[in-house]
């Protein structure tokens, strides 16, 4: 028998705050998490700004000995998983059968800082000086592995890697696994820590990043003057749980996950299909599986990267999937305008925003929106959050390689 799936725990480390609730409060306030890059000297770089995590010290959180053996992306993921487990009430030993608890946490690039540091060490000092922890710290599945070890999760584990759609696919695949009875609960999400010279140089070379040095206008999704995304970092982990298991233990339920679409454009390695057929089909699949009724109050947390190609293509995809009237009636926003693009973590933190929006009846804004673009003609909730009577939410994400994901959620009401 198919199971309904609830979100019962949330955890986040983001450019807006080092907890989920701090992040959500900042989203609702329209806070900009973008600022000058402090992780490295940008004198030789065209890109000057990013959305960095602030005030998170791995040495304080894990202790110096353990922190030095954890790449920053894993540190973020572990901290977010701790918060999510506590929020769900799973930090009590017998709260769940650990063989029925899984981990689906991915990363777009894994421990890139660790890899780069060791490449320089090997080049400068020879191969014998490579760290014995290098491989374990750099591989993108290590966030899932370390979370499983930390929380004794012995159920299904799947570290997803689909670039910018990573954690959306992680949430979707976790939803499917629980729906079909393979687990009672899964820690699902993603993490990234790639605001480093090498990643910024690479994204700049493929003309993906904005070179606007003004943090207050650098990230402006759907605006006519948008010119590239802003790198972000952090992690978000959600506890997805079967509804029956959640109700039996009296868990708090933020929202219900009801549908998932997973497609590929099969068009280009980095550019989205301008016809938007792939993302439209992902949305349609999620809507059909969840029996979503857009006329009953719909919020769409769009991928909205602030790139010329993505935002217009995604707008077309939303209209193609839902129809012009339903698309125009929906509340749409891009929280990347505040968090920057958190790459592997972005899908999960946007699903979190959808769940909180449904529970609290608040749509977070798209900040920095000033000049409408005729190719982006939906209601993007410009600059200020709005109250709304919401029943449904969609989170959409697109990744390099043509990967598309859509997650459908429904407001939970106890019957």
Predicted features along the sequence, with ranges:
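Acyl-CoA/ACP chain-elongation machinery
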Residues: 182-227, 260-274, 304-311, 328-379
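Active-site-proximal alpha-helical scaffold in enzymes
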Residues: 77-90, 140-144, 148-192, 230-251, ...
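Conserved small-residue
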Residues: 9, 27, 81, 103, ...
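Glycine-/small-residue-rich "gating" segment that lines the acyl/pantetheine channel
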Residues: 124-131, 169-172, 176, 192-248, ...
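ACP-dependent fatty acid/polyketide chain-elongation machinery
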Residues: 1-66, 244-256, 352-366, 410-415
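Condensing-enzyme catalytic core mediating Claisen C-C bond formation in acyl metabolism
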Residues: 4-8, 32-35, 214-290, 298-299, ...
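A glycine- and small-aliphatic-rich helix-loop capping segment at beta-alpha/alpha-beta transitions
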Residues: 21-26, 112-127, 177-180, 200-213, ...
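Conserved beta-ketoacyl condensing-enzyme motif
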Residues: 7, 20-23, 28-163, 191-200, ...
